[in-house]
């Protein structure tokens, strides 16, 4: 089949290559002319035969919205737009309505696999009607990993991005658990080779995972992570997961704590701990540490 692909960055560029390897035609557009096959969205749409499928792989928020707005003016009834970026699931219904007014279908798709997806395949979670999903199915089949799993029609519009959001929330908590265990192992004198402890966990243990494999890769590059500063950003999906939990009264202690740990990583000197130190000094005369004057 033919596919229009908008956004050819680290993920989009590799996805184009994987789909082409499966025998499909992909026409890609990107603001970077060095990687684009066409010079505009209008040219991309003009090169596709109907009914068209256009996959949007651009940053969530304004970039996705402006792309969908433009496609709504260019596409025809019966065409389908797939949002494969990390959009907030609450935006999906709005996009479906905007496109649906013009008879254009919409499918939201959460994509996991990162830079490894070209060779290993991408895990796909998508939401939309059976009719619209069927039009995209050959592309889903090309992108997914080999085997029976790694791809799911999660439900109606919004379900794909919601599932990907929860996936990323779980990822936050798993990374935090590995990080806490690593720090504790590094702290004690009795464990002399933390890297090899992590490596030993890769086979036969209940905590083996791809994230653990990546942790071992990182420790092979920098055994004690001395080259890194302990600063961790968050992409937004961890926050959205916690907000969804609050909206649905679902307790998420591990995921929430892992998000807050990232906030703490960005503070060189915690204002909260200053207040705690001051209060302990006030009520109990406990010692405090003063800032060193320069």
Describe the residue ranges of each PLM region.
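Hydrophobic beta-strand scaffold residues
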Residues: 26, 106-107, 252
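Helical "substrate-binding/catalytic lid" subdomain
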Residues: 125, 135, 158-286
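Rossmann-like NAD(P)-binding element
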Residues: 31-94, 100, 118-128
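NAD(P)+-binding Rossmann beta1-loop-alpha1 motif at the extreme N-terminus of oxidoreductases
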Residues: 1-52, 78, 115-117, 281
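Structural motif
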Residues: 6, 29, 57, 83-85, ...
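Rossmann-fold dinucleotide-binding core
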Residues: 67-69, 88-185
